Swiss-Prot record:
<keyword id="KW-0456">Lyase</keyword>
<feature type="active site">
    <location>
        <position position="128"/>
    </location>
</feature>
<dbReference type="InterPro" id="IPR033697">
    <property type="entry name" value="Ribonuclease_T2_eukaryotic"/>
</dbReference>
<dbReference type="GO" id="GO:0005576">
    <property type="term" value="C:extracellular region"/>
</dbReference>
<dbReference type="GO" id="GO:0003723">
    <property type="term" value="F:RNA binding"/>
</dbReference>
<protein>
    <recommendedName>
        <fullName>Ribonuclease T2</fullName>
        <ecNumber>4.6.1.19</ecNumber>
    </recommendedName>
</protein>
<feature type="disulfide bond">
    <location>
        <begin position="22"/>
        <end position="41"/>
    </location>
</feature>
<feature type="disulfide bond">
    <location>
        <begin position="30"/>
        <end position="77"/>
    </location>
</feature>
<dbReference type="Pfam" id="PF00445">
    <property type="entry name" value="Ribonuclease_T2"/>
</dbReference>
<feature type="glycosylation site" description="N-linked (GlcNAc...) asparagine">
    <location>
        <position position="93"/>
    </location>
</feature>
<feature type="glycosylation site" description="N-linked (GlcNAc...) asparagine">
    <location>
        <position position="256"/>
    </location>
</feature>
<keyword id="KW-0325">Glycoprotein</keyword>
<feature type="disulfide bond">
    <location>
        <begin position="40"/>
        <end position="143"/>
    </location>
</feature>
<comment type="similarity">
    <text>Belongs to the RNase T2 family.</text>
</comment>
<dbReference type="GO" id="GO:0006401">
    <property type="term" value="P:RNA catabolic process"/>
</dbReference>
<dbReference type="InterPro" id="IPR018188">
    <property type="entry name" value="RNase_T2_His_AS_1"/>
</dbReference>
<dbReference type="GO" id="GO:0033897">
    <property type="term" value="F:ribonuclease T2 activity"/>
</dbReference>
Length: 276
């Protein structure tokens, strides 16, 4: 999805602009040649934001014709990352926070498209906010004009959902003839090209488990803050997590299927595994 379309989607979602205006000439994150002092208008060090998605089949999660949300992660410009950046803003009551903010529609959507494939949804949402959301510097409480407690939590979750809605991976793959099948296999280049078509031609990261496609990461640089700023698609900063060919794309509820355990995130660049 293009940058203008993302901006229109933000307006359509009814976002309340509670952040100070950012300078028009501020650079995109990770694209600056000199240091940028305005920490509320420039995402740093986590200047590469990733909208990440799961395809869980055993047990299945979410609708059979849709990928599901993993999260929104602020990676550093070199592909490294921070985690659990503010213990004082770690929460264990995401559902209650959203209800208090009147975000019932968001909560309903999350229950359908942001499930924990094996466990409690609330625990999953808490983990994503506590580990990743607290590391986005442009949504810290001091960046709001009129801050109310936990406002940034609801904004983070809403932004994650908004980005996900603009990245329909299932339809993008299907349009290219790539559909879930118990026996058919695909080339990595075919999958990457199909997904790049909804990401301004920029290649996402794809991951496989036991030869089966199970995760996608879409990368962005941001101009302005992470909620109201302009999102610019960029190519993946991480090496592919699937082989070049013979990739399975299994139907949900398949007996010979794989599950993307949300607790783990593979860093293919360093061949390490990290809690996610």
């Amino acid at each position: 999805m293009g940058m203008l379309a993302l901006g229109a989607m933000q307006l359509a979602a009814g976002a309340v602009f509670e952040f100070p205006s950012c300078p028009k000439d501020i650079p995109f994150s990770c694209q600056n040649s000199t240091a940028v002092a305005d920490s509320c208008c420039f995402n740093s060090p986590g200047g590469a934001l990733l909208q990440t998605q799961f395809w869980d089949t055993n047990p299945p999660s979410g609708p059979s014709d849709s990928w599901t949300i993993h999260g929104l992660w602020p990676d550093n410009c070199d592909g490294s990352y921070g985690q659990f950046c503010d213990k004082s803003r770690e929460y264990s009551n995401i559902t209650a926070i959203l209800q208090e903010q009147g975000r019932t529609e968001l909560l309903s959507y999350m229950k359908k498209y942001w499930p924990n494939y094996e466990g409690d949804d609330e625990e999953f949402w808490e983990h994503e906010w506590n580990k990743h959301g607290t590391c986005i510097n442009t949504i810290e409480p001091s960046c709001y004009k009129d801050y109310s407690p936990q406002k940034e939590v609801g904004d983070y979750l809403q932004k994650t959902v908004d980005l996900f809605k603009g990245l329909d991976s299932y339809k993008a793959l299907a349009k290219a003839g790539i559909v879930p099948d118990s026996s058919k296999t695909y080339k990595r280049s075919e999958i990457e090209s199909a997904l790049a078509a909804i990401h301004d031609g920029k290649k996402p990261y794809i991951s496989c488990e036991d030869g089966a496609l199970n995760e996608i990461w879409y990368f962005y640089n941001i101009k302005g803050n992470a909620i109201t700023g302009e999102y610019q698609p960029i190519d993946t900063l991480t090496s592919p997590g699937c082989s070049t060919s013979g990739i399975k794309y299994l139907p949900k509820k398949s007996e010979n299927s794989t599950a993307s355990a949300w607790k783990f995130r593979s860093d293919k660049a360093s061949q390490s595994v990290r809690f996610n």
